[in-house]
């Protein structure tokens, strides 16, 4: 059964102090979410986070942590994830990829630096997960970066946080892609794509053009454990918590 959660990047502006994080967790819990992904929040310790999420009955299931944390302070990252008692150690994008002129060189740099990280996390019973955008579906030397990463990392402990918005943005059918790559999925980001004045915008689940019946069905068939609602910004200037409510209500009506 798919477990529905909230990606805290959606409410990052309301999570920069411990007090605001506490208030936001209360609101998220009151909406009905029980699972969360930590991303974009203030630089809090696991010991600061744990009593707050416990108070509101929330369970962390995934992170987006700065890539340098894994490279410079891996043992601290292991402790952080274990203190909060979850396995999916995520990064939001590939460092260097947007900065380096030679994208193939950026991939090689990422693989070289993160292969030992992936192996060390595996030794500790943790999973490394990479979040896609559209850029992973550019063709470099005739191959999508996504496929190149899977091939070069060559580890059953290298997984993906699949973002269905960015799949659709890249011209990829999310449902078919989920089924094709089911063994490489750590969790899935649910956000919709709405066209506003000929421009793709992030939108609440069910408000845009993605075919959610197909996506949800594919996630079930692929045994996806966590679907995490995310919205990077707000096409209609909604309060982020209002957007989380809209997505939650839509998905709950569809059995999640």
Predicted ranges, named:
Residues 9-11, 65, 94, 133-135, ...:
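Short strand-loop junctions, especially beta-strand C-caps/beta-turns
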Residues 14, 38-39, 67, 107, ...:
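A generic secondary-structure micro-motif detector
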Residues 7-19, 64-71, 100-105:
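Active-site mouth loops of central-metabolism enzymes
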Residues 1-31, 82-85, 140-162, 168-256:
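Histidine-acidic metal/acid-base catalytic patches
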Residues 30, 35, 42, 47, ...:
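Active-site acidic/histidine proton-transfer and metal-coordination neighborhood
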């Amino acid at each position: 059964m798919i477990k529905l959660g909230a990606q805290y990047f959606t409410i990052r502006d309301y999570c920069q102090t411990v007090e605001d994080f506490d208030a936001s967790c209360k609101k998220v819990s009151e909406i009905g979410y029980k699972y969360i992904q930590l991303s974009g929040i203030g630089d809090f310790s696991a010991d600061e986070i744990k009593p707050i999420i416990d108070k509101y009955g929330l369970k962390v299931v995934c992170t987006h942590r700065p890539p340098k944390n894994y490279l410079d302070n891996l043992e601290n990252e292991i402790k952080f994830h274990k203190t909060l008692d979850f396995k999916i150690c995520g990064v939001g994008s590939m460092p260097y990829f947007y900065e380096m002129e030679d994208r193939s060189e950026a991939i090689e740099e990422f693989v070289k630096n993160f292969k030992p990280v992936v192996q060390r996390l595996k030794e500790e019973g943790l999973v490394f997960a990479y979040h896609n955008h559209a850029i992973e579906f550019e063709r470099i030397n005739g191959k999508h970066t996504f496929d190149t990463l899977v091939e070069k990392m060559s580890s059953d402990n290298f997984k993906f946080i699949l973002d269905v918005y960015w799949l659709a943005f890249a011209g990829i059918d999310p449902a078919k892609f989920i089924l094709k790559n089911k063994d490489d999925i750590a969790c899935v980001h649910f956000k919709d794509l709405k066209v506003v004045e000929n421009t793709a915008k992030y939108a609440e689940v069910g408000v845009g053009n993605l075919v959610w019946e197909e996506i949800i069905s594919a996630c079930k068939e692929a045994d996806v454990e966590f679907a995490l609602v995310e919205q990077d910004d707000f096409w209609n200037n909604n309060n982020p918590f209002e957007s989380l409510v809209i997505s939650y209500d839509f998905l709950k009506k569809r059995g999640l």
